[in-house]
Swiss-Prot record:
Residues binding Mg(2+): 550, 577, 579
Pfam families membership: TPP_enzyme_C, TPP_enzyme_M, TPP_enzyme_N
GO-annotated biological processes: branched-chain amino acid biosynthetic process; isoleucine biosynthetic process; L-valine biosynthetic process
Organism, scientific name: Saccharomyces cerevisiae (strain ATCC 204508 / S288c) (Baker's yeast)
Region (Disordered): 43-68
Organismal lineage: Eukaryota, Fungi, Dikarya, Ascomycota, Saccharomycotina
Cofactor(s) listed in the protein's UniProt record: Mg(2+); thiamine diphosphate
Name of the protein in its database record: Acetolactate synthase catalytic subunit, mitochondrial
Amino acid sequence: MIRQSTLKNFAIKRCFQHIAYRNTPAMRSVALAQRFYSSSSRYYSASPLPASKRPEPAPSFNVDPLEQPAEPSKLAKKLRAEPDMDTSFVGLTGGQIFNEMMSRQNVDTVFGYPGGAILPVYDAIHNSDKFNFVLPKHEQGAGHMAEGYARASGKPGVVLVTSGPGATNVVTPMADAFADGIPMVVFTGQVPTSAIGTDAFQEADVVGISRSCTKWNVMVKSVEELPLRINEAFEIATSGRPGPVLVDLPKDVTAAILRNPIPTKTTLPSNALNQLTSRAQDEFVMQSINKAADLINLAKKPVLYVGAGILNHADGPRLLKELSDRAQIPVTTTLQGLGSFDQEDPKSLDMLGMHGCATANLAVQNADLIIAVGARFDDRVTGNISKFAPEARRAAAEGRGGIIHFEVSPKNINKVVQTQIAVEGDATTNLGKMMSKIFPVKERSEWFAQINKWKKEYPYAYMEETPGSKIKPQTVIKKLSKVANDTGRHVIVTTGVGQHQMWAAQHWTWRNPHTFITSGGLGTMGYGLPAAIGAQVAKPESLVIDIDGDASFNMTLTELSSAVQAGTPVKILILNNEEQGMVTQWQSLFYEHRYSHTHQLNPDFIKLAEAMGLKGLRVKKQEELDAKLKEFVSTKGPVLLEVEVDKKVPVLPMVAGGSGLDEFINFDPEVERQQTELRHKRTGGKH
């Protein structure tokens, strides 16, 4: 009994032990530990090819650890001493092995830009029929394309670039993917191993540089270990909370020829699970699930707060709706969670946070129980932490509510907000396990009466157009949402970063998962266009629209010709107010209208589009808008539509820094008129 208890406790300890990704001797443990934190069925996982030598998982995983194993047979001893060897790579260069490994990982698209240090790989994939290759104009574009592809397809985005500046140019996309939990595998060229540390031409310590913005990174030291490192990269990128990984490929490694067979287990994708530890984890998690169900059944004013984690599993949105319907719980989502819950459902509260719906913010502040699913309580959602969820904190102190956190990444639990119950592991899987324990609720009349009152009192509002006035950007979004959805096609929207991003989140009607692709955690301007190209590659039959602002679009506008070259019929909408709108909004509110370097000179976007092979459209007047929007979405190839919109239009509601979620600035026409007069006075009529 003592031995059994000890083994069990050891398994539980191992289950939740944090293993540093940078600890090279623990590389095999990293991949294993990642699998402990999530289910064996996850939406982002690449489908492995079946092993031909023996079943997976190995039979030994099902053996009781206390049971004395039978004496191995002579054949078993021989197999143990002589592991299965893969001869299929013998005689191939590292570049050719890379090509084959992409096939084994079911990669169908690679985004990249060639260069000297990575030429052995590019030579090997010349005319390759194993995957589609998309060439950007800049390596940053390749990274954001891979992000858009991953978000739309559920598969990891793959990037292949050269050393030095080629590698450093993908640091921003990796940091972006790391912040938003997007699976991405980046392969970078490197100078030959003999030249490392000599300041050779285009040498950069990309492993060191990318350490803080990847889940894991590695430099491949020999051609023999190349297949293993590629397999580890895909496994780690798609396990637990998805994210970017980097594999650095020295030129002599990719040019080298493999002379001897290597173990088969290093050349085939692995899907083995440690069943002993999984059983120990399941027991611990079920205790948390039971406690969570008890609190949900007790709650009077619960709210579901849902992030992008619910989208990591194909069944996530379905189970979310089932829980909401079963217990009559209203649902609010983060920016990245938009689309996971149908906004036309009366239980939808829309988005919460700094520029979220006032109803959602008020509901969170007044809820006695907050059920966080696949969300991480970032600062744009919580506002001032000391003022966050006061009613839930009061209910927690009285033992009748609080905060429940369904989260796959242990580091996100209790990082920002103290939770009463943490359910660690794949959020969707654990929701499924909890469902039968939730009591059906017919109605929550008092709670929804209050919510519906807030909805009527605080709708998204803005100063609408008057005859002859400039077009309001919010109007463009609302009209485009209807026109696009009326086509009957599957619609995907990407955005850049700025006011246009928030207006898209607020005024588009989000009904389906994986239809809103944007940069949330890092807030990367220029994200929209390349992400749209990647999404279109992943979903060629979908209507893909990039809603962009002029300042954000300027960051990566060179990718217009990439859209043409890739044959992607993306639709690019530019809301042109000739300013860095989100920054000028803050300058108006908090810096007495001192617009320091926030107005840029734009190119002629229509001539630019036409020069790069796209159709260009422009709208200046209100009466032109409807017809141009219809022409925009019905155009067969790539098209750019520029709409000249009103300037100095604020995104509201807004929760200012240091404020609680219920202390928002809401639209007031009289206040806006006063602000306009004050702005004219302070800027001498210039703005």
